[in-house]
């Protein structure tokens, strides 16, 4: 059973490193494997309990960094494996059980935008891959467009497109909250620049950083 994040070196240092530490600190389970894919690493400060993959890529853009994790997941994990993918700018706030993890990852579970008329109603901040063909469909549809031509929101455009083919379950509040911390939630994510650049939100995340 697996949790995957992907980012560049800057985002790893600023966000992903603390996310991975927080997950392991609260959930040092032998059944849970943590994975991090880093694009263009430079002096990577690795954690012993994390499985790392890296790549060198000349055309790094925000859209590429947003979508590459789903391409990595399709290559790395077999369809029957239980996989959760998170935004790097998240933090773990409580323990979860193996049964809870299996339950949420058995289906394609996705973070839902709180606004009904949002351009992207399904958000990539929290995605579980289910145990069927979703991960392959997602990666293949992302790659129909050459990676250096990906535009902002490409990952969520494809996520929306596939909602007609795969039945998504809305990520429950018990697993993920966005911006404002909820004591019930396993993860808090700062999805969006509005939250990442506002101390009102970042200070909530900092409370869970493991020193």
Q: Model-derived features: where do they sit?
A:
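N-terminal anchoring/stem segment of glycosyltransferases
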Residues: 1-59, 78-79, 188-201, 206-211
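Aromatic-acidic/polar surface patches that form glycan- and anion
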Residues: 9-16, 62-66, 117, 122, ...
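Short loop/helix-cap segments at secondary-structure boundaries that form the rim of catalytic
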Residues: 41-49, 98-102, 180-182
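GT-A fold catalytic core of metal-dependent nucleotide-sugar glycosyltransferases
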Residues: 65-116
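A short, conserved beta-to-alpha structural element at the edge of catalytic cores
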Residues: 106-126, 130-133
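Catalytic core and acceptor-binding pocket of nucleotide-sugar-dependent glycosyltransferases
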Residues: 126-208
């Amino acid at each position: 059973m697996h949790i995957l994040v992907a980012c560049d070196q800057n985002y790893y240092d600023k966000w992903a490193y603390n996310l991975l530490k927080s997950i392991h600190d609260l959930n040092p389970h032998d059944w849970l494997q943590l994975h991090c894919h880093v694009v263009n690493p430079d002096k990577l400060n690795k954690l012993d309990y994390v499985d790392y993959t890296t790549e060198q890529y000349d055309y790094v853009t925000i859209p590429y960094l947003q979508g590459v994790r789903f391409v990595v997941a399709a290559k790395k994990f077999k369809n029957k494996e239980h996989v959760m993918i998170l935004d790097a700018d998240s933090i773990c706030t409580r323990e979860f059980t193996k049964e809870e993890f299996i339950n949420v990852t058995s289906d394609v579970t996705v973070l839902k935008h709180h606004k009904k008329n949002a351009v992207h109603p399904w958000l990539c901040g929290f995605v579980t891959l289910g145990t069927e063909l979703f991960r392959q469909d997602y990666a293949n549809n992302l790659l129909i467009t050459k990676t250096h031509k990906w535009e902002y929101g490409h990952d969520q455009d494809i996520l929306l497109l596939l909602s007609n083919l795969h039945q998504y379950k809305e990520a429950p509040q018990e697993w993920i909250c966005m911006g404002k911390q909820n004591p019930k939630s396993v993860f808090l994510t700062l999805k969006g620049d509005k939250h990442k650049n506002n101390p009102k939100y970042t200070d909530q995340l900092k409370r869970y950083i493991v020193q």
